[in-house]
Design a protein with these regions (language model features):
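Detector for methionine-enriched segments
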Residues: 1, 58, 73, 177, ...
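A short, hydrophobic C-terminal helix/tail in secreted or cell-surface proteins
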Residues: 170-189
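Short, charged juxtamembrane terminal tails flanking transmembrane helices
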Residues: 191-194
């Protein structure tokens, strides 16, 4: 019993650690839906996309499903004038996004220091260099002013969209609670030995 309790505590700590570490690496999520579009629509389509930003590399993983018609394009828009609202120009087009499908997945990596990944109008509007465009995009993501948009034939202005939001970073209290819990388990195990 004592040994299984210790193993259980160790397993719980190991299970929590990767999730907490991953959140600190620059993980961004976008939960896209029809009601989040501008204007809102009744599409049952959805996506829970993940963007991982490490240095100048942004990796996108965009699964999507239940769209009402075939896809025509997808991209990241930036920079709205207020968080979680408004429309903005295209910042990064997904040039190889799967077209004509109602569900699927898209994965790609973007080098934010490469001018060719940006829409030319976005690049020009934000300083004309990849460094300034990338800085504007990162600032907009931090301010919740950038969004993912998937367009379809039925909704050419966009069937589903979701604002990019930083995944929650655990507060120091989370680690403290984990430490207190493990210490408590250790004390219980020690008591039972005596």
């Amino acid at each position: 019993m004592k040994r299984s309790l210790s193993i259980l505590a160790l397993a719980a700590a190991a299970a929590c650690a990767p999730a907490l570490a991953q959140a600190q690496d620059g993980i961004i999520r976008a939960v896209a839906s029809g009601p989040a579009e501008s204007p809102p629509n009744g599409s049952p389509g959805s996506s829970v996309a993940t963007f991982d930003i490490e240095g100048n590399i942004m990796t996108a993983d965009v699964p999507f499903r239940d769209l009402l018609s075939g896809t025509t394009m997808a991209h990241i828009h930036c920079c709205t004038t207020a968080a979680f609202t408004g429309v903005a120009p295209i910042a990064i087009p997904f040039t190889d996004f799967p077209l004509g499908v109602t569900s699927g997945s898209y994965s790609a990596s973007f080098d934010l220091s490469d001018a060719t990944i940006y829409d030319p109008a976005f690049l020009a509007a934000f300083g004309g260099t990849p460094a300034s465009a990338g800085a504007a995009l990162i600032e907009a993501i931090a301010s919740n002013e950038a969004y993912l948009n998937i367009h379809t034939t039925q909704y050419p202005a966009g069937e589903i969209r979701g604002f990019l939001v930083a995944a929650p970073i655990p507060e120091p209290a989370t680690w403290g609670m984990l430490g207190v819990g493990l210490a408590g388990l250790g004390m219980m195990a020690r008591r039972r030995r005596a």
